[in-house]
Amino acid sequence: MKTQLKGDRVLAEKEAVAEFYKTGYFGRPKGEGLELSLVEAAFLLSRGKLEIELEGTMLDFRYFFEQASLRQPNFELKYIVYKDLKERGYYVQPSAADFRVYPRGSHPGKSAARIFVHVQSERQLLPVKLLQDSVISAENVHKQFILAVVDEESDLTFYEVKTAVPKGEMTEPYPAIKTDATFLEDRVIAWDAQASETLYKRGFYGKMLDSERLQLSLVESLYLFSRGIITVRDRKGKVFSFDEFIEKASEIESFFLRKYSAYKNLRDSGHVVKTGFKFGTNFRVYRKVESIEKIPHSEYLVNAIPADFEFRLSVMSGAVRLANSVRKKMLFAVEKDEEIEYLDISRTKM
């Protein structure tokens, strides 16, 4: 069947509606003919189902592929993903999110699409705002959002991305006590033996320096400070104000306040939050801890990121793969105005 390449579309005559759309759901009817996207046309051309003409010249697959790449950004990436999904047996249609994918055993007209797919090269930076907006758009119409990443060898990795509202089960985020502590070089120590034991065993804060004294991280210290649990002094005995503590902590960690915002949000929502350093993340997070002697496996790994953050996909891939390999969810805590919004990213199979 002969077709015409026009701009970023391939136009076919009336008979194509019956041959391609009504049987395979390729393209969309327009007027009396059929309009195919470039990836759909390339797929059909590769299988010898149609011929494509440009200004009187018939295009072979190579020439058409080159022309399509000139006319549509990321064409080759989209074709790789489209071809993969079609060969898996899915009905796939182009959409604003790159593709919409129908459930197995279904097709357009029988049921609604189930998945929105966004295509990305491993080399491209991915703004978190773009990802958030895309996920929310999908979830608003009850769709699953899939990020399809094409690596330099044209292999595909699929990630499910969704919003999350983590909820913990700790009823007492901080014990009702008051005690003194000292800000040393890059951590804080609480000195009172009873208070240290209570914070450690009931609140699951810090790590005991010895049988009587408790070491606290900077985010733990500011959280307890903000709740009036500890009074923090410098090494000469001067009491810190809240702002002075933040200023000093920020000299030690440039992103301290962003990290603290995520920590506070997680603690306030009933979680136990500990360092995620061994996993290469900001935090490991527990929904419930009943005893310091029997700490369960953490449910989440969390990285705090700013609203203008751009993912390097190789780094994101490593974080997600590690989290999934140890049966944890990888959450990204996005600081947005005064709120924290979470993205849950996990590898998935199509």
From Swiss-Prot:
Any single GO BP term: tRNA splicing, via endonucleolytic cleavage and ligation
Gene3D superfamilies reported in the protein's UniProt record: 3.40.1350.10, 3.40.1350.150, tRNA intron endonuclease, N-terminal domain (3.40.1170.20)
Xref: InterPro entries: tRNA_endonuc-like_dom_sf (IPR011856), tRNA_intron_Endo_cat-like_sf (IPR036167), tRNA_intron_Endonuc_cat-like (IPR006677), tRNA_intron_Endonuc_N (IPR006678), tRNA_intron_Endonuc_N_sf (IPR036740), tRNA_splic (IPR006676), tRNA_splic_arch_long (IPR023516)
Reaction(s) this enzyme catalyzes, per UniProt: pretRNA = a 3'-half-tRNA molecule with a 5'-OH end + a 5'-half-tRNA molecule with a 2',3'-cyclic phosphate end + an intron with a 2',3'-cyclic phosphate and a 5'-hydroxyl terminus
Pfam family, one: tRNA_int_endo
Keywords, alphabetical: Lyase, tRNA processing
Active site residues per record: Y286, H297, K328
Gene Ontology CC terms: cytoplasm
Similarity-based family: Belongs to the tRNA-intron endonuclease family. Archaeal long subfamily.
Task performed by this protein: Endonuclease that removes tRNA introns. Cleaves pre-tRNA at the 5'- and 3'-splice sites to release the intron. The products are an intron and two tRNA half-molecules bearing 2',3' cyclic phosphate and 5'-OH termini. Recognizes a pseudosymmetric substrate in which 2 bulged loops of 3 bases are separated by a stem of 4 bp.
Protein name: tRNA-splicing endonuclease
Organism: Methanosarcina barkeri (strain Fusaro / DSM 804)
Gene label: endA
